[in-house]
Amino acid sequence: MFMFKKYLYVLIFTTSFVIGSSILSAQNIVSLTELTVHKTPTCGCCKKWVDHMEDNGFSVTTEDHQSLAMIKDDLKIQPKFRSCHTGVSQEGYFFEGHVPSRYVLQFLSESNPDAIGLSVPGMPLGSPGMEVDNRFTPYDVLIHFQDGTSK
């Protein structure tokens, strides 16, 4: 019985340490993450998405542009995956459109070989920055790779 209790205490301690370390690691990633968001000066939902990211611990700088096409072209964001704004991390990853902060955090905390960014194509209702009452349109968060593929 004594060995079982000892084993149980060690298991509980180890599990709580691992979970705690993961949470601290995720929080550190957010606190260190700076995004530059490229948007047009008149877009209201872009500002709401920036607020969503800041509310979730990201440091965000915005840059207004009359046209975003060259920026999106340089980042290799295909037209069918584009939205109204583009966030770019310090590491050069893009976050196109209304990507929820939790997916940005997950992407940045995991190893994604050959990945170049995430996107939420279009402007789906219910996504961060596109909240309208309780309306919701299901949407996909896509991961993009250097070879032009996505999933």
Regions found by a protein language model. Give the residues of each.
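N-terminal secretory signal peptides that target proteins for export/translocation
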Residues: M1-K5
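Bacterial N-terminal signal peptides
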Residues: Y9-G20
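Local sequence-structure signature of Cys/Sec-based thiol-disulfide redox active-site neighborhoods
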Residues: N28-N56
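Short active-site oxyanion
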Residues: E34-L35, F58-V60, E91-F94
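Thiol/selenol-based redox catalytic cores and closely related redox-interacting motifs
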Residues: D74, K80-K151
